[in-house]
């Protein structure tokens, strides 16, 4: 058999290697070019880009990287890989978009990696999560073991009691003071290896398209391949107390506002135990009944007011809400003040016939001489009709929600009824004109083991950073003015939204404030007393363990809603969550 020149054999193989994109010098560039051509066709294909999973990273390690056999398994077989709630799902653009695969499982983190060319970012494009996304607890009903016959009989015997407890819980949840339920909100933030800088975004887990805005640096236009890397996860958020104020204690009274009314007995009634029948006999609303059911053997002080009041106009700000304000005082005995003890909260109970519906409690202070002073405010131009009737109820209690040092108005405004966004609106209480960069200080503190996160609503000519608000501190917001003529905030202008994160967290040395397009997240491991290697996600100076994030459940389209225990913020039917990337100026 004749010998073949090895050089000829190598020359014959090189063209095939170049066509296949493997081996040799420049193979990576050829592979990236081929991927970019496929990606360009995918992005231009109507209407959306479907993503497939290529990596499933568990808390113990990597299950597979480029193994297509895992992707071709049935959904039931895939569950054994992704059934654990402590997993990371990685989505890329490597697979054919015409055959989107169904992914099932519960994950705490979804990572998205796309390799693009700079010119492909000029036009907006969409990213479709083809599998319905739902937020729910990891220990849902679908993962519990089947009940035995004895357990089923016991459950049936207690079913009426459970219905009654469920109804009572529903009534409590409808009342603001008992609404301590956690909710979930989706967070999208760039990974540390991302070249594209999308803005830090929070949005409800609802079906539909959510806009992600991004900045394209001039340096990126000179790169051959641009990496877009996103982390998608769900934060636990909780609504702060809005209708109750903590009782503040001060040594001396310094104010120019005089007391419009000084109360004495029998307007003051001290109840060591709260009689529900007596309280609800003259209740102002159904909410009062729900509030009274939460009373234990806690000492309660009730201040009854039915008088003609004098009103003073205030512009709102440090002193409290805007509107007409009246100050009322009451002298407490030394025994009564001591019996109340610490952690006392006050709330108004209105009379529907003789109380303005917008009457709120704006300040509550007990001085060292035993004088209790409180302000009531109504936002109107004319004084309410006389007399005004309401009750101030003071009670010692333990709250499980963040609360403010003073009335949240006019700085923090609750969202409109039925609004999809759960965040408080942060507004300017007065007209403000800025010529240069400025730091706004909002004179409110909040208390509790939570983190406040301010997400700005940027206006033309100025920008504000995303800011983490720590407990027991003022909220300080930096405003960067880019317009030469300065910027003007009209009164009640929207600055942004405020969220309170209830996920367990630890503070690290990261920056607590950054521009929206500069916020990045990092996935790292940390040794704790409970786990030798616990995976955590760090963002904006805070680290959160993956197990403390709200689980995200990816269910197949045929999955019925009753098959899984979901929270309030779930996707309706089987509509997917869509992310649209728009590149340009933020």
UniProtKB/Swiss-Prot annotation:
Renumbered to this chain, region (Disordered) spans 1-47, 136-183
Q: Indicate which residues form the motif Nuclear localization signal.
A: 161-170
Q: Where is this motif: Nuclear export signal 1 (NES 1)?
A: 228-237
Which is one Gene Ontology cellular component term of this protein?
Answer: host cell nucleus
* Residue spans of biased composition, Basic residues class: 10-19, 32-41
Q: How does it assemble?
A: Interacts with the DNA polymerase accessory subunit UL44. Interacts with HCMV major transcription-activating enzyme IE2. Interacts with host HNRNPK.
Q: Relate the protein's function as given in its record.
A: Plays an essential role in viral DNA replication. May participate in the DNA replication initiation by interacting with the origin of lytic replication, oriLyt and subsequently recruiting other viral/cellular factors. Additionally, interacts with and shuttles IRS1 viral mRNA from the host nucleus to the cytoplasm.
**Sequence similarity:** Belongs to the HHV-5 UL84 protein family.
This chain's protein is named: Protein UL84
Report the source organism. Human cytomegalovirus (strain AD169)
What gene name does this entry carry? UL84
């Amino acid at each position: 058999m004749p010998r073949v020149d090895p050089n000829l054999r190598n020359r014959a193989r090189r063209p095939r290697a170049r066509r296949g994109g493997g081996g040799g010098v420049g193979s990576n560039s050829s592979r990236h070019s081929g991927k970019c051509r496929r990606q360009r066709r995918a992005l231009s294909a109507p209407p959306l880009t479907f993503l497939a999973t290529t990596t499933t990273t568990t808390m113990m390690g990597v299950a597979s990287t480029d193994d297509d056999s895992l992707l071709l398994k049935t959904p039931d077989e895939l569950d054994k890989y992704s059934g654990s709630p402590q997993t990371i799902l990685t989505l890329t653009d490597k697979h054919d978009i015409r055959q989107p695969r169904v992914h099932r499982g519960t994950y705490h983190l979804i990572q998205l990696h796309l390799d693009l060319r700079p010119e492909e970012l000029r036009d907006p494009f969409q990213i479709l999560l083809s599998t319905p996304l739902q937020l729910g607890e990891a220990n849902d009903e679908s993962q519990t073991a089947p009940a035995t016959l004895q357990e089923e009989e016991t459950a049936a015997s207690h079913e009426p009691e459970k219905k009654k407890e469920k109804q009572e819980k529903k009534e409590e949840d409808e009342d603001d003071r008992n609404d301590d339920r956690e909710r979930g909100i989706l967070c999208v933030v760039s990974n540390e290896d991302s070249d594209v800088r999308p803005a830090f975004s929070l949005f409800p887990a609802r079906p539909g398209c959510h806009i992600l805005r991004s900045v394209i640096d001039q340096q990126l236009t000179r790169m051959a391949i641009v990496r877009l890397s996103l982390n998608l996860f769900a934060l636990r958020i909780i609504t702060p107390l809005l209708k109750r104020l903590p009782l503040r204690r001060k040594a001396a009274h310094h104010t120019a506002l005089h007391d419009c009314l000084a109360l004495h007995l029998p307007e003051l009634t001290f109840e060591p135990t709260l009689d529900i029948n007596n309280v609800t006999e003259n209740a102002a609303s159904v909410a009062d009944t729900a509030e009274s059911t939460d009373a234990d053997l806690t000492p309660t002080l009730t201040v009854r007011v039915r008088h003609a009041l004098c009103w003073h106009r205030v512009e709102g700000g440090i002193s409290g809400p805007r509107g007409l304000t009246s100050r009322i005082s009451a002298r407490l005995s030394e025994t009564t003040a001591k019996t109340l003890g610490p952690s006392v909260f006050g709330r108004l109970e209105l009379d529907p016939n003789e109380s303005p519906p917008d009457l709120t409690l704006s300040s509550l202070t007990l001085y060292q001489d035993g004088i209790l002073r409180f302000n009531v405010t109504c936002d109107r131009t004319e004084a309410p009709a006389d007399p005004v009737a309401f009750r101030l109820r003071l009670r010692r209690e333990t709250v499980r929600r963040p609360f403010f040092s003073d009335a949240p108005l006019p700085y923090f405004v609750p969202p409109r009824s039925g609004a999809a966004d759960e965040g408080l609106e942060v507004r300017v209480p007065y007209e403000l004109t800025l010529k240069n960069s400025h730091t706004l200080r909002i004179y409110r503190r909040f208390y509790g083991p939570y983190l406040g996160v301010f997400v700005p609503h940027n206006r033309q000519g100025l920008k504000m950073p995303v800011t983490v608000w720590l407990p027991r501190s003022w909220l300080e917001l930096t405003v960067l003015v880019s317009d030469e003529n300065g910027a003007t905030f009209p009164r009640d202008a929207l600055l942004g939204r405020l969220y309170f994160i209830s996920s367990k967290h630890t503070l690290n040395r990261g920056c607590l404030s950054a521009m929206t397009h500069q916020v990045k997240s990092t996935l790292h491991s940390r040794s704790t007393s409970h786990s030798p290697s616990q995976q955590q996600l760090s963002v904006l100076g805070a680290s959160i363990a993956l197990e403390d994030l709200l689980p995200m459940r990816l269910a197949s389209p045929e999955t019925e809603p009753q098959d899984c225990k979901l929270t309030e913020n779930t996707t309706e039917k089987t509509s997917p969550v869509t992310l649209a990337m728009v590149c340009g100026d933020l």
